Regions:
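Extreme N-terminal starter segment of soluble prokaryotic enzymes
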Residues: 2-6
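Short, surface-exposed acidic-centric catalytic microdomains
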Residues: 24-74
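Short, well-ordered beta-to-alpha junction loops that form the rim of enzyme active sites
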Residues: 11, 107-110, 150
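Internal, conserved structured core segments that host functional sites
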Residues: 103-118, 122
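Short N-terminal binding/cap micro-motifs at the start of the first secondary-structure element
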Residues: 14-20
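Short glycine-enriched, charge-decorated loop/helix-capping segments at active-site entrances
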Residues: 22-23, 119-125
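Short, active-site-adjacent cap segments at secondary-structure transitions
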Residues: 14, 48-49, 111-114, 153
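Divalent-metal-activated hydrolytic enzyme cores
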Residues: 1, 19, 27, 46, ...
């Protein structure tokens, strides 16, 4: 891990910031990284969304499409929360750049953080290929983005 600095989803380090008010603690992250090797963020909270909040999914595209205003992040009540997701993505990018983060470890399947697979917008549990809004923005700016599972495969 030498020479790498990580931006990590706050929920993965035990912060109760998920939409349901819970965390997704991955103890191995805490065990394998020193506090001076990472900075944490929850893009959704940084974008102004509360804890807890209604579940949200990207409809008609993926995170890149949301950044291009060609798709929307809609919560389960039908509210368009795209602006908060975009604001949070830019907050994550700003934090990553300020700390010169080279890598991001972000929560799988999240409409903000996921890389590779996201929920399809139907709120039925179906997944499609695509990145979350924050993951897409970080990738656009040259960061290496991985899920917690990909990080664990790398270290175990």
């Amino acid at each position: 891990m030498a020479g790498k600095f990580y931006l990590i989803s706050a929920c993965l380090l035990g912060h109760k910031v998920r939409y349901d008010g819970r965390d997704c603690l991955v103890k191995e992250l805490v065990d394998h990284l020193l506090p001076d090797q990472y900075v944490t963020i929850c893009p959704e909270v940084s974008g102004g969304l509360p804890i807890p909040r209604p579940a949200a999914e990207i409809q008609s595209g993926d995170g890149l499409d949301v950044l291009l205003y060609q798709a929307h992040v809609i919560d389960i009540n039908g509210t368009d929360v795209s602006d908060a997701f975009i604001k949070g993505a830019y907050a994550a990018l700003d934090l990553a750049q300020r700390f010169q983060a080279t890598h991001a470890i972000l929560k799988a399947h999240s409409p903000s953080c996921s890389s590779k697979l996201i929920y399809d917008g139907s709120f039925t549990g179906n997944k499609i290929q695509g990145d979350g809004v924050t993951a897409a923005l970080l990738k656009q700016h040259g960061m290496e983005v991985m899920t917690e599972d990909e990080f664990l495969q790398m270290i175990l």
